[in-house]
Amino acid sequence: MIRIIKNAIPFLCGVAFFISCNSKSEFLTPVCFDGKYPDESAQDIEIVVSDSGEVNFKIFAPVMNKYEGANSYMDFPEGIIVTSYSNGEKHSVLTADYAISEDRIQRMEASKNVVITDLQKKESIRTEQIIWDKRNKIIYSNVEVVQIKADGTTNRGDGFEADERFTKYSIRNPRGEMLANEF
């Protein structure tokens, strides 16, 4: 009996090996996402960007997805809020419904209902797309923008360019309404 069991064990292992290794891979699918799914994902994130202990920017997003590879990037599919600071005080706030940040080229693009508010001047710019060039420390847009000033007047333009903290900016081809002081 023991001899039968000793001979049966290698036979059963061999049968199991050949049965499990067939040419059809019905149950085995290689895991290769090709960048369609994030390598990392986080919810309710806050990123603090500082220099020498001084906060320059705070970035908040409900969802952040990170994709690794030669052209690694992060996207913020549910929106983003970027607050810039100057001398420890909030200076401006950017909100958008979507954003993508590309590491290699040091560029962030925000799109869909983009609003940048200068908290000191109480002015804002609304547009559908902006690009933050981190290398050159500028923010710009090449699509229509609407500027809303503190007094309620509005100007339109064909884009704008600003420093990355949004302390100085200019609108391309401005047009709109102006309030004249009464004499």
Description of each model-found segment:
Residues 1-183:
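Mature-chain termini and adjacent capping regions
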